[in-house]
Swiss-Prot record:
Nucleoside triphosphate pyrophosphatase that hydrolyzes dTTP and UTP. May have a dual role in cell division arrest and in preventing the incorporation of modified nucleotides into cellular nucleic acids. This is dTTP/UTP pyrophosphatase. Its cofactor is a divalent metal cation. The active site is at residue 80.
Length: 202
């Protein structure tokens, strides 16, 4: 008989990639909509921004649990990812032309991918993952073909490293899972810090 699936945490994210990554390491979780506006503050660095948004998502999720007696009060994980090129923060493309421009700007360059992850209950803890990704030179035609697949449209920086854009990546230094949207090493550190024994289901 299969053991009962009981969540260790809530994941405050609508991202299927983050859910897939937690599944990979055996974390039992329930997910919720974070409902947080991702607006860069004036003079806010990308590092501070991703940690703040990750923490705001986790805090908002935990507050919603406190207000809902029907749901079990568990720690809430939040995460946020941004792509940074020449100190410019690249979020999700606003449309086709913006997405094509974004991908063209990444062609033949090295950019940073920052992912902040937070875990909140009556405690709060955060971690930051910083990765460097180098794209080969991209042809305009392949950028347009890639956009037409629909894959880039909801991704920070306009690409998914685990998808078709894998063929653009010449070099990666850092966390592959962090570039996907949830750095598993840092996420596991937070789970360990909160004494959540996710490995018991391995």
């Amino acid at each position: 008989m299969q053991p009962e699936y009981r969540p260790h945490i809530y994941l405050a994210s609508n991202s299927p990639r983050r859910r897939e990554l937690l599944d990979r390491i055996g974390v039992h979780y329930a997910w919720m909509d974070p409902g947080v506006d991702e607006v860069l503050g004036e003079d806010e660095s990308p590092e501070v921004f991703v940690l703040r948004i990750a923490l705001e998502k986790a805090r908002a999720g935990y507050r919603s649990l406190q207000e809902d007696p029907e749901r079990e009060l568990l720690p809430v994980m939040g995460a946020d990812t941004v792509v940074v090129l020449d100190n410019e923060l690249l979020g999700k493309p606003r449309g086709r032309e913006h997405g094509l421009e974004m991908l063209q700007s990444l062609s033949g360059t090295t950019h940073r991918v920052l992912t902040g992850v937070a875990l909140v209950d009556d405690r709060e803890a955060t971690r930051l993952s910083v990765s460097h990704v180098t794209f080969r030179e991209l042809e305009r035609a392949e950028i347009e073909r890639y956009w037409a697949t629909g894959e880039p449209q909801d991704k920070a920086g306009g690409y998914a490293i685990q998808g078709r854009a894998a063929v653009f990546v010449e070099h990666l230094e850092g966390s592959y899972s962090g570039v996907m949207g949830l750095p598993l090493f840092e996420a596991a550190q937070l789970l360990d810090e909160f004494e959540i024994d996710y490995q018991r289901h391995w």
